[in-house]
């Protein structure tokens, strides 16, 4: 019920209040028509981490300018055709929202802001289209002022850097990866380990989202952006590697080969010693030699070969991860030439995006706006412009959620709860206030208290709803005016927009956790089907980036869905392993003779058919024919002499283990 009173929370609330009051003061000093917009904006853009405020600031300003330009272009030209104007603004908001949802970086704010800013400026200006340019300039200055004040205060007054938080998250993640590897090598229950470590995928996605703010950070760690990117690539690869390693250890149960057992013990000792880089290079060379030493085509031999290949890749990823981690404390820490080059690579890994859902969200926003406009026009409601404006804002604010309706309802309820407080201030307290210093003292108690809740993700929505409702209802201007009719009309418009946002979103856009999880699974299965049918391997880290991102989103949804019938037998981590095995197999394909390629292609086509059937809702059990195809491909690849054959065999062994964990042991030769 009560907020946390730690140092970071108190400082955030004080900084946010200072930024809001600074924006309000400058707004008064400049004679802006609605200085309260600057105050409200300062709270909306405030974030606990300074880098997050700074990274979004530029995109927010650009989005506001673009939205204002759209309003200036549309309103004067279509004001005499109200239906067309409403349609144009609704389509603008819906289109901007849909495109913004395809980008989960701070860049998305540019288009989202440009969408609902056009509505904020355009709809209230229909009665005075000739003044649209002046109104647009005023709104841009007011909103830009709020963004600027929040950015300056959170950057200069005891900023909390993203880099410090990110460094701790990376250190914790790498430590958990080390413990996962040790648990696997000590022979712990592989399935239980994988289940316990699935949250590492969600943590990897969270780290990626934090990392996008790092170039804008206030600390010197912003110079380590390339190191974080390279580190994240190793994280993406480690999740399927460690999961696959656990599977091979579980399949082998007991390893009698003394050299292999000694290698496993050496890897265990190396991890326990802190994964020193020099010893890691020696271990990788030793493991690669062991893996290249052919032990025949028996199933146990192929499993050992696959185990050693996985172990070598795991040691490499862990060694590189620890070497990169050392760069945070020592910028001159040595790196191999290849690793050094990876820290200088540009670009960003792709993340999961759902185009159909984005289009549906944009369509729902457009329809909610049009229904609000119809109510406004047909009722002849003079102050009804607030309805389509708030419909646009609500649909945009919560579009990224699976089911936005509960959040929109909650926002509406807390906005309603803010009205009694707003009325007390407007009609009882503010009329007695004279001068800005006294206004600041009067506004401090509610705003400072609400600011304590914003850093808590569970309570931030409720706090912002009360705060925005309170601030917008007061509508502080240079000359105070308390008009009950305007107060009631403006707030009524908000709730009409809220109502249409709820109705349309519930009818078109909302989905439960089951449906959301199912969509993600289907997208993953379709990706695996396409990869299996391709004849060229994608870059491993790039493919892993999307699969791990989906796994991070999917894991909490599957946990919430529980053991429902639709998800019995679903293992998202297994699907990730299958994907990385397919990458390894596709990479080995080009070095095979024609007969080996034909066998491999038949197996890959069978895997593609299996996952395409899964995506279409067919039974989950793979066919015996697919097992026969994989075994035929294994017979050809296990005797191949190409250097890439070890990785190919490891990939096929992984496919067999993941798709047919209960199948009898592979038979190398068919008796004639």
Language-model regions: role of each:
Residues 1-216, 223, 323, 327-571, ...:
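A transmembrane helix-and-boundary motif of multi-pass membrane transporters/channels
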Residues 173-184, 188-189, 228-344, 581-672:
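Soluble C-terminal extramembrane regulatory/interaction domains of multi-pass membrane proteins
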Residues 181, 199-218, 246, 282-294, ...:
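Extended amphipathic alpha-helical scaffold segments
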Residues 509, 513, 535-623:
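Extended, charge-rich low-complexity regions and/or helical-solenoid scaffolds
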């Amino acid at each position: 019920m009560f907020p946390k009173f730690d140092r970071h929370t108190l400082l955030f609330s004080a900084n946010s209040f200072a930024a809001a009051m600074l924006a309000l003061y400058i707004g008064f000093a400049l004679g802006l028509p609605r200085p309260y917009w600057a105050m409200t904006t300062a709270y909306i853009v405030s974030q606990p981490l300074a880098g997050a405020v700074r990274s979004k600031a530029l995109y927010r300003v650009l989005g506001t300018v673009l939205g204002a330009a759209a309003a200036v272009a549309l309103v004067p030209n279509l004001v005499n055709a109200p239906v067309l104007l409403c349609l144009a603004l609704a389509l603008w908001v819906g289109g901007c929202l849909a495109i913004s949802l395809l980008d989960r970086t701070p860049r998305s704010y540019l288009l989202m802001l440009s969408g609902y800013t056009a509505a904020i400026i355009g709809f209230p200006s229909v009665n005075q289209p000739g003044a649209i340019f002046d109104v647009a300039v005023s709104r841009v200055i007011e909103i830009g002022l709020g963004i600027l004040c929040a950015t300056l205060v959170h950057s200069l007054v005891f900023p909390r850097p993203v880099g410090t938080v990110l460094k701790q998250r990376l250190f914790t993640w790498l430590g958990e990866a080390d413990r996962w590897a040790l648990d696997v090598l000590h022979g712990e229950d592989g399935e239980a380990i994988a289940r316990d470590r699935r949250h590492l995928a969600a943590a990897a996605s969270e780290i990626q989202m934090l990392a996008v703010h790092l170039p804008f950070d206030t600390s010197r760690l912003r110079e380590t952006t390339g190191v974080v990117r390279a580190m994240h690539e190793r994280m993406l690869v480690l999740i399927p590697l460690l999961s696959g390693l656990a599977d091979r250890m579980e399949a082998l149960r007991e390893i009698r080969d003394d050299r292999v057992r000694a290698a496993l013990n050496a890897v265990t000792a190396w991890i326990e010693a802190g994964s020193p880089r020099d010893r890691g290079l020696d271990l990788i060379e030793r493991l690669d030699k062991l893996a290249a030493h052919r032990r025949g085509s028996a199933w146990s031999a192929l499993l050992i070969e696959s185990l050693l290949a996985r172990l070598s890749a795991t040691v490499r990823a862990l060694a590189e991860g620890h070497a990169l981690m050392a760069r945070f404390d020592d910028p001159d820490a040595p790196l191999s030439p290849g690793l050094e080059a990876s820290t200088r690579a540009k670009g960003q890994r792709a993340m999961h995006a759902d185009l159909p859902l984005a289009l549906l969200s944009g369509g729902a926003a457009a329809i909610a706006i049009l229904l609000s406009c119809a109510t406004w026009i047909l009722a002849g409601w003079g102050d009804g412009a607030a309805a389509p404006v708030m419909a646009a804002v609500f649909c945009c604010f919560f579009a990224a959620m699976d089911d936005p309706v509960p959040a929109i309802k909650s926002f509406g309820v807390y906005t309603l709860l803010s009205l009694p407080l707003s009325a007390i201030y407007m009609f009882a307290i503010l009329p007695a206030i004279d001068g800005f210093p006294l206004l600041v003292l009067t506004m401090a108690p509610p705003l400072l208290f609400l600011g304590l809740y914003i850093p808590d993700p569970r309570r931030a929505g409720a706090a912002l709803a009360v705060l925005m409702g309170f601030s917008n209802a007061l509508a502080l201007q240079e000359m105070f005016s308390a008009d009950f009719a305007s107060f009631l009309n403006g707030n009524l418009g908000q709730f009409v927009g809220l109502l249409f946002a709820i109705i349309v979103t519930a009818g078109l856009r909302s989905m439960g956790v089951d449906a959301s999880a199912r969509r993600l699974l289907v997208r993953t299965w379709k990706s695996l089907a396409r990869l299996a049918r391709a004849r060229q391997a994608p870059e491993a880290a790039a493919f892993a980036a999307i699969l791990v991102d989906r796994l991070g989103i999917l894991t909490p949804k599957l946990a919430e869905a529980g053991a429902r019938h639709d998800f019995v037998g679903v293992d998202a981590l297994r699907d990730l392993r299958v994907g990385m095995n397919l990458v390894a197999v596709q990479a080995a394909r080009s070095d095979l003779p024609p007969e080996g390629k034909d066998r491999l292609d038949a197996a890959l086509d069978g895997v593609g058919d299996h996952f395409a059937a899964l995506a279409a809702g067919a039974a989950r059990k793979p066919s015996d024919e697919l097992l026969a195809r994989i075994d035929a491909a294994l017979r050809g690849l296990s005797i191949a002499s190409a250097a890439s054959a070890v990785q190919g065999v490891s990939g096929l062994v992984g496919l067999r283990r993941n798709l047919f964990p209960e199948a009898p042991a592979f038979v190398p030769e068919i008796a004639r």
